[in-house]
Structure formats: structure tokens, C-alpha cells
Amino acid sequence: MAKVDQNEALFERAQKTIPGGVNSPVRAFRQVGGIPRFVAKAKGSYFWDANDQRYIDLIMSWGPMIVGHANPEVVAAVQKAAETSFSYGAPTEGEIELAERICALMPSVEQVRMVSSGTEATMSALRLARGYTGRDLIIKFEGCYHGHADSLLVKVGSGLLTFADSTQNAPSSGGVPQDLVKHTLVLPYNDVAAIEEVFQKQGDQIAAVIIEPIAGNMNLIQPSKAFLAAIRTLTAKHGAVLIYDEVMTGFRVALGGAQSLQGITPDLTCLGKVMGGGMPMAAFGGKKEIMSKLAPLGNVYQAGTLSGNPVAVAAGLKTLEIVSREGFYECLTGQTQKLMAGLKAAADNNTVPFTVDSVGGMFGFYFVDQVPTSYEAVTKTNIDAFKKFFHLMLDEGVYLAPSAYEAGFISIAHDNAVLEEIIAAAESSFKKL
């Protein structure tokens, strides 16, 4: 009697009660094809699926699990917090401690407000910027994903990149009114001339510029120094708010986030993922002058029943304590670079056009000769080669992001033995391409 594939059985079952069988589109394997892996448990750098098959995890919950799955210290902190209650709907000392820790690690953040998701963080930051400036227009960049708030679903990256309308201001999702996104201007990433032109024409109407300081939703794309400098100069000159969406990069690429590596001081910063240690937790913060416009002090309303959830706060505090230890990011960055060098060498050994890039514990690889620097360039990479490579690596027990438009992540638990296993799997996979 043939053994039942539990992943397939669970996927079939899930589709009866969950749209598409998943609670976030990229998990459905639509771009790569095949059956999604349903996770049963995870530890360190590994997870086991419903068939009890072990995989090396190279997405780490899309970034949050920087100290490894089920880290004993984080688990203990969560258990202790859960013993008192899962939620109060009232202030706690833990919220203050987490806010103090964030403000200490990110000097641009003078005050911070907790929320429950990255989408809430960016949505609230935009509302705050509009309330502070009294303006409506916002600028975002092609391929940057800032959550699924309506006004930001225009030319986004991630799973939507595969079917987004190419029209300048067309919504990337059904259900988003064209009338709403008319307030969103979309510009090419890394294009200095484009942003200079828009500010020259409409500078006094722009409330905010929101940017992924290292784009991670069109694979990994780094900004040029000139591009970032132009954005900071123009927003300051015209009184627009510069919002750094560090939901992905905050505490992932460096202890002070991407802004600490780039020497840029944003007006507002959005955080998530790592700051919650894998729990539903996010935040937005920045200049006290701007943050004071939030209710109950000001007239910009924002609220949430589960904001500052005590269990999530406990996970976040312990995670930030661990990543703050001496040598953490040097080790994480070194391991990521070692992995990238190994993947590149394996591709070169098999004459496969392939490039890599990384920052801290975040990486990207591309089936093309040069590292892309824009949304347009990413769309021209070899997607068919990626799909084949994804499944070959999956067969070797290595779980990559099931999309060519997503960055990858490692954790401090990815030691040399794990890296060697990944590189050996890549060598075998490249030979079969």
C-alpha cells in the first residue's frame, strides 16, 4: 500500500476551509509549483514537515527567527509571560522596557508605538505623516512591499510582483479603488532623476516618502548612496516625512537596522519581524515632534486591542537581548557571506549564470550575470531556472523561499556544518540544471 503524502492530504483538506489552502499567498507554491510543505515542528536551523522530512530552513519565517527556531531562552521568556495571562488590554512595564530598548538601539526613534503587524505599522506611519504635514501624496518605489494597506498596494513586490498591472498607478490587487491610489506616486527604485523631478513639480504636496532601505520583496536589492542621499535631502527640503520601512531589515541586517549601515536618519521607522521574536508584533516610531500627533495626545487616531501583547513583548525583549550580545552580527554576517560564496562557487563550477548578494543575515541570489539594482532588472532574471533549482534543493532537504522575488534569511543557528550541507546540496542541484 502506497504511503500517503501528508503534505498533499493537508493541502487538499486546507483548501476546503481556507482560500487557496494558505493564510498568505506565497505559501501556496504558485510560482514554483508543487505541494506546499506543512510544518510540524522546528528547531534551530531546521524544520520537519508533515511527513517527518527534515529541511534546512532558509527563510526562517521570512526573517523573524534570527536566533533560531525554538530558541530555549526565548521559549522560557514566553512561557513565563504566558503564565500571567495572554493579554490584558492595559499597559504593562514590559511595553516600556521594549520601547526603551528600541529607542536605545535606534537613535532616530525617540518615541515608539506598538502594533501587531508590519501592515499596521506602515499604514499607521502613513496616516501619521499625512496628519503631521496636512498633505495627501505619498511616494513609494517599484517592487517595494509595505504590507497590504490599500494605498500601498501599487507596483508592489513579493507575491504580487508576478501579476501586478504595469500601469503606473494601477492597484496591484482587486478591491483597491483607483480613486484611492491616485494619492500614491510610484517611482523606480534607485532612480535619482525621477525623485528629483517629482519633488521639483509637486514637493509642497508630498506628505511622505516610504522606502525599504534594502528591498527584500523583489529578491534583495540594495540602494545606491546617491539615491538615499537624494531622498533624505529632498524630503528635508520640502517638509515631507521620510519613512524607513525596516519591518524586514530592522535588527536583521545590523543591531541598528539598515539606517545604521547607511548613515541615514529617517523621520519615522517601521519595525516588525525580529523585534517580536516570531510573535505577532510590530511598531512604528520616530521624532517626538511627529509621534506627539498620535492619539491620545494628538488628533491622528491609532489603536489596537492586542498592541503591546505581553507574550509577544517577552519574546521581543529576549530576542533583542540575544542579538545585542557581543559578536552576534559579526558571526551572522560572516556565516551569510560564507554561504553566498559557497553557492556562487557551486554555480561557477557548473557554468550556471548566477549572482549573489547579502547584508547581515539577509541574502539574495539571482539566475543572471549581474546583481539587479531595480524592479525592472529583477523581472528579467531567469525564473524557469529558479523554479528548477528550488525543487532540486527541496529534494536535497533545503527549503528556499518559494518565489524568485523573495529574499532569504539565515539565523545564528546556521553553523558551519549546516552551511556545508547547503553548499553540497547546491553543487548537486546545479549539476542537474
UniProtKB/Swiss-Prot annotation:
It catalyses: (S)-4-amino-5-oxopentanoate = 5-aminolevulinate. Coiled coil: none annotated. GO terms for cellular component: cytoplasm. Its EC number is 5.4.3.8. It comes from the Bacteria. It comes from Polynucleobacter necessarius subsp. necessarius (strain STIR1). One of its GO terms (molecular function) is glutamate-1-semialdehyde 2,1-aminomutase activity. Pfam families: Aminotran_3. The modification N6-(pyridoxal phosphate)lysine is found at residue 273. This is Glutamate-1-semialdehyde 2,1-aminomutase. Pathway: Porphyrin-containing compound metabolism; protoporphyrin-IX biosynthesis; 5-aminolevulinate from L-glutamyl-tRNA(Glu): step 2/2. GO terms for biological process: protoporphyrinogen IX biosynthetic process.
